[in-house]
Amino acid sequence: MKKVFNYKKLFSILLLAIALVTSAVFVAGCSDDKGTSSSSSSKATYTVSKEEKDYLSKRFSELSKTNNETVAYVYAPGTQLDEPVVQTNDNETYLDKTFEGGHVPYLGTVFMDMDNKKDFHDRLTWLFGHARGSKVGDHRMFNDVNYYDKQEYMDKHKFVVIETPERKYYYEAAFLTIVPETTSFYRLDFENDEDFLSQLTNVKKDAATKNDSVQLKGNDKYLVLSTCREEDETIRSNLYLRQIPDNEMNDFLAKHKDELKYVATR
C-alpha cells in the first residue's frame, strides 16, 4: 500500500525553518548595531562648557550692539591678529566700511565670503581683510597674515581661534600660498572628499611655507585668511588652516590650552 504524503507535517517543518532563519538574522543585526554603537561612543566628543557659553553670550551681545552683521571673532595667539568678523550679501561693502560703521579705505572690516555658511561648517571658509603694510603703524586687519611667509614665524604661531555665538573653533596653520587675485583655487563648492583633497594637494604644491605635521584629508574642514601683498595689490597671501575636529578636541585642548588664550591687542 502506498504511503500517503503528510503535507501538514511538511508545512510545519517549513514554518519552523523560516522562523529559525529569521531569528538568526535578527540576532546578527542586533549584534552589528551594538558594535557600531560601541565604536561610535568610544570616540571622545567635545562639549561646550557653560563657562564658554556664558563668555560667548556676553561677547557677542556687545559686538552685535555695535554691528548686527557680526558672525565671529578671529585671533591668532602670539600675534596682533585680533578682529571681529562680519558677513553681508556682497564682498565689497566691508572693503572700506569699518566695524563701527565709518568708511576708511584700506581698513574696512574682516569679512566672511558672502556665500559661506556662518557656522564654519563648509569644507572651505574664506575670510578677507586688508594688510595695512609697513607704512602704517598698526597691525590691524590681516596685516600679520603676511608674516606667515617666513617658516620660523609659522612654526611659532601655528594656531588661530574662531569664536562664534555658539562655540569656539580651533585651527592649525597648514600652509601659506602667494597667488594672483584671479587664482582658480578660489572655490567654495566641492563634489566630494576626493575633489576637496585634490584641491588642497594642488594648492599646497607651490606653498611658500608649510606645516608638514598637518596631514591633508578630504573630510577635514579648512579656513583661509586672505589678504593682499604690500609689494603688489594684485597678489594675495592665503593662509590655509585645518579645523580641529570634535573627536580630536579634548586631546588638542589638553595639550595646547595655555597657548590659545585670548590677549587683546586692538
Predicted regions and their residues:
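N-terminal secretory signal peptides that target proteins for export/translocation
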Residues: 1-7
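Sec-dependent N-terminal signal peptides
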Residues: 8-20
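C-terminal motif of bacterial Sec signal peptides marking the signal peptidase cleavage site
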Residues: 26-29
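Short, conserved catalytic or interaction motifs in soluble domains
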Residues: 32
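Solvent-exposed, non-transmembrane regions of membrane-associated and secreted proteins
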Residues: 35-266
